[in-house]
Every structure is written in C-alpha cells, then in structure tokens.
Amino acid sequence: MRRRAFLRGVGAAAGTATAAALGGRASTRRVAAHPGPYEPYGSIDVAGAKEAVVGPDGDVAYLATTTGYATVDVSVPDRPELLADVRDPLADRDGGPLRVIFDAKLDVADPTTLVVAGPANPRRGAISGILVVDVSDPARPVEVAFHATDFPVHNCFVRDGLAYLTGNDGGRNPIVILDVETGAEVGRWSVADVADAWAAVPSGLRSVHDVYVADDTAFVALWDAGTWLLDVSDPAEPTLRGRVDVPDPEPLAELPESAVRRRATLPPGNHHYVATDESGTLLGVGRESWGRRVADDATETPAANVAANDSGASGPAAPLSAAPDAEFVGGPSGIDLWDVSDPAAPVPLSTVPAPATPDPTYGGVWTTAHNFELSGGVLYSSWYRGGVKRHDVSDPAAPTEASWWRDPDAASFWTARLAAPGEREGFFVASSMGVGDGPAGLYAFPDHAGEQADPSGVLPSGTATPRPRYGTGTAGGSDATTRPGADGGISAPGFGVAAGAGGVALAAWRLLRRAEE
C-alpha cells in the first residue's frame, strides 16, 4: 500500500511549514508516464542535492543537501513532494552548523535511523561528525544525537547500529566504526597497517573515499590503492579478507608530489564508489577519472583545480565542445564488475564504460562514473552530465544497456537508487546537483527499458573507451594519447600503472588545508 495518503495525513502540514520556514526551495515539475519515449516520471527541485537513498518501502527518499538534509515523498513518482527540508543543523553549537554535507544513509537494519555526515572536506574551526536523526515520521525528523569526530566525514555506511566512516586524517586514513547510539569507537582499520610499503605511500594516493557493507564484509574504496575487502564479523577487529584491483605500493611510494598532483585525475586507479548486489557476490567498482590535454600535460595540475574536486558545487556550465584536433591523456572511467564469491580470489567480469564526452578534462564535461546501485540483476548508474543509465547485468560478464537519459545542460547526476522494481509500476530515483546556476534536485525514472526520444545532441553518441585497471595496460613508460573520433568519443589504448598515480580526494583536502593555513 502506498503511503502518500498517510504521509499527507500525519506530516503534510509539518512538511509545508518546514519548507516555508527554511526557504521553500522545492517546486515540482510533471511529465507524462510511459508508454512513450524514455523520460523522467517527474522531478523536484531541492537545493544542494547530493547523495540520496530510498526507504525499504520505496515511498520516501532521503537526501544530503550540502547545507542540511531533506525527505521527499516519491510514492507517486510523477508528483514527488517535499516532506521536510532541514537547513543548517547544529547551528547552535560551537563551530556549527554542520556543513558540506554530501552523504546521508539509512541504517540497513533499522530504516527509521538516518545518519547525516559531514563535512565532506576539512573546514578549519567547523564541527565534524555524524548527526543521528529519527525518521520514523519522515515529515517530522527528530535529531537525537551528534557524535563528533576529529576528521571530516566524506562518506559513510550504516548497518546494525554501526556507522562505518571514511576517516581521512591525512595520515593513516582509516575506516572508523562508531556505535550510532553512544558514539563510542568500536574499531578501525587502515591499509597502512597491512604492510610498511603501504604506510610509505603518500596518503593522498590511498584516501578512503567510500565504504559499503554486505553481511559481514566491508568493501573499502581506497582511490589509487584499489578496493579492500574486510571481515567485520567482529567490528572491533576488522581483518583482511581480500583485495580488488590493488597495485604494487612501491611505485606509488616513489612518486614525487608533483607527479601525484599531475596524475590526480587520471586512470587507472581512482576507486571511488563500491557496492554489491543482494547476494554480496557481485561487486561493482566505480572509478572516477578525467583526462588532460596533451598540450597541458607538461604542466602541473593547478592547485585550484584539484581543490575544487570535492567541493560539490555544480560549477560553471562548461562548454559542451572541445577543439576538434584536441588530444588527451586519460579520460572518464566506468564501473567494473567483479565476482567476489571467493573474496580471496576476485574475478574481473566486465566493465560498463562511461558515456562519451566532447571534453574529458576536469574543466570540461564530466561523464565519469559516480554512485550507483546493483539490484535484481540491474545496474542503476549515474554519470554526472552523462546522465543516468540502466544495464541488464543478469549476465554480469556481458552487461546490456537497457535505458539512458541525459540532459547535460541542466542535470549532473550524483546517484541512482532503486525505489520500486518492475516494468509496469517500478521506478528509480536519481539526484542531480544541477549545472551552473540551474537547480539541483531529485528525479524519478521508469524501471523499464526505453530510448530517449530527443537526447541533447551536445554529447557524442556511444561510450568512451573503457579505462584500464591496474596491470591491464600496455607495457612501456609513455602515456597513450586520445583524440575525439568521428562520433566524438574518446579512443585510446590502456596505459601502465604510472599513468594512474593520483589521489584526487585527499590531494584536494591537503591543498585545501594549505590554502586555509
């Protein structure tokens, strides 16, 4: 039974009052449902939208909104409605409010508990930690606790009353496990504890960007240090269970800082987001990367460019074109699928490539992989201005694209999350941080195959050449170059390990710290 009537009955007045008191930032647009061309069912503007998750009944979406958090009723997907829009939480505390909020997660085992994390990046003098919110009535969220940390919290995962936090401190960069009720630290793990060779790698190359927990296994995305699988059956003592696409640490340890900066945005590496399907045996690894113009490649990555990476701002609307004779190093990466049924011996299955882009540089048109969900044999994925996609991954060795929607002039998608499965009435939601001065918000899309009737012609057709994983590139010390082809896509052979020695997340934070000092 859909809950729209219930939500209206118990919380519509509160939701309206909250929205009005906090700026009335939401406005709804309607579109026609299927049959017909593939397009959104509906969307709603929510300022600052970043990560989104959906409750288990598929009726409510919960958003991190940069300056707060919000709940949206999506039970009628062509008419999403704002329930609550909370801005500047903890404003009454020293160092408050909690800011730069990019992540919010429901407890998988107790979806009445929402954890709001921040700041995503260091802010001098600002509070940092997790805000625990009771969302048993999503129209009337109640803040029940705040647990402070001595590190920024870029991302988190919550399961069984435990919050798994990205503990980037510029040193060991651990995963930190907290008790959601008490705030007590339960355990922690760092790749620097695995071997001295990893401790010698610059922290910017082994920043912990995200974490996902399935049953008693935590999957930790460590940027250029690959993805690590931990046994957390005893969360007080996480132990190593396996590793995915992990390079030799010694070449990374030998890179000078100038090389780290130069390669901060380039593949391979760049493990950004990880998630499994319901079985816990099919793992998706999203790799976030960009390219560099060959003409600029001899120069160091500008500090301002790197520091902007995790700002979360939509930024200016980069021109949707590049010089026709431009050559590039690197490019956007996709989502790798792995069989992890034996965690000690993961098997690569396939790569879902990124949409093609006319300009793969950091200042260009982003189409690299961002957050996603694997559910019911379908991969729901977001690609910034490259749009959202659905792939049939019932045979994960041969993914098939089933639908793709994009509007690169208006939407830059942060995540895609299943709300209700099924071709007839199913749908998924996707949050967009907007483009330029355009609004951010939440979209609802049909959960069926289809083709967009009139996609914007500014993006090339097809996909970018899949970026190599570690150990899959060609031998030799030179980087391959790419040139937009006839269809505007990026084509390039793979490169070796040295081409991907970046660590954009923590490199950005280090530069931000320097700028603030």
Model-derived regions, located:
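Hydrophobic alpha-helical segments
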Residues: 1-517
